[in-house]
């Protein structure tokens, strides 16, 4: 299968959409690694599966219900103890920086 290649402009568009500032070194690195990921995905999508029923076991969950622990509520620490360890709190809650300006 043909190797897929992202060009520099596509990497810069992705960086802008992700609010990232990339050095020339990172642009080159991302071009190489993302192109390899896309090529691998195209190869995986090209695999033909003749009988979906025979492949069902490949997609089944590995963990059975018996393997899971029972949910139980515990009180490992109290609110005051927790809030003493945070940089800033307000009204008994953890105050975090605003994400949207």
UniProtKB/Swiss-Prot annotation:
InterPro entries associated with the record: Asp/Glu-ADT_sf_sub_c, GatC
Gene Ontology terms, MF aspect: asparaginyl-tRNA synthase (glutamine-hydrolyzing) activity; ATP binding; glutaminyl-tRNA synthase (glutamine-hydrolyzing) activity
Pfam families: GatC
Signal peptide coordinates: none
Domain of life: Bacteria
Keywords annotated in UniProt: ATP-binding, Ligase, Nucleotide-binding, Protein biosynthesis
Key word Ribonucleoprotein present: no
The EC number(s) this enzyme carries: 6.3.5.-
Subunit relationships: Heterotrimer of A, B and C subunits.
Functional note: Allows the formation of correctly charged Asn-tRNA(Asn) or Gln-tRNA(Gln) through the transamidation of misacylated Asp-tRNA(Asn) or Glu-tRNA(Gln) in organisms which lack either or both of asparaginyl-tRNA or glutaminyl-tRNA synthetases. The reaction takes place in the presence of glutamine and ATP through an activated phospho-Asp-tRNA(Asn) or phospho-Glu-tRNA(Gln).
Similarity-based family: Belongs to the GatC family.
The protein, known as: Glutamyl-tRNA(Gln) amidotransferase subunit C
Source organism of this protein record: Chlamydia pneumoniae
Gene that specifies this protein: gatC
């Amino acid at each position: 299968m043909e190797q897929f290649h992202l060009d520099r402009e596509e990497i810069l568009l992705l960086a802008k959409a992700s609010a990232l500032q990339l050095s020339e070194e990172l642009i080159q690195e991302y071009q190489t690694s993302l192109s390899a990921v896309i090529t691998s995905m195209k190869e995986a999508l090209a695999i033909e599966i003749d009988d979906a029923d025979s492949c069902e076991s490949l997609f089944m969950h590995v963990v059975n219900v018996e393997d899971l622990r029972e949910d139980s509520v515990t009180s490992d620490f109290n609110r005051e103890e927790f809030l003493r360890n945070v940089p800033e709190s307000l009204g008994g809650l953890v105050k975090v920086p605003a994400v949207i300006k």
